[in-house]
From Swiss-Prot:
This is Alpha-elapitoxin-Aa2b. It comes from Acanthophis antarcticus. InterPro entries: Snake_3FTx, Snake_toxin-like_sf, Snake_toxin_con_site, Toxin_cobra-type. Expressed by the venom gland. Belongs to the three-finger toxin family. Long-chain subfamily. Type II alpha-neurotoxin sub-subfamily. GO terms for molecular function: acetylcholine receptor inhibitor activity; ion channel regulator activity; toxin activity.
Length: 73
């Protein structure tokens, strides 16, 4: 399966890793920069912790970088 591993950076996952994931969470700069985003491949969907969100899928390029809401001018 082909997953995004970074912004506009699709790569073929290693054997045995057939799940793409998008994990997001807030850090100290969340209010000014938005959530931290991690994209990648995994054998199984990562475990969701209380402070982050995880979305998993299993088709090629199904985990693009999330669109961040824009602030009004």
């Amino acid at each position: 399966v082909i997953c995004y591993r970074g912004y506009n950076n699709p790569q073929t996952c290693p054997p045995g890793e057939n799940v793409c994931f998008t994990r997001t969470w807030c850090d100290a700069f969340c209010s000014s920069r938005g959530k931290v985003v991690e994209l990648g491949c995994a054998a199984t969907c990562p475990i969701v912790k209380s402070y982050n969100e995880v979305k998993c899928c299993s088709t090629d390029k199904c985990n693009p970088f999330p669109v961040r809401p824009r602030r009004p001018p």
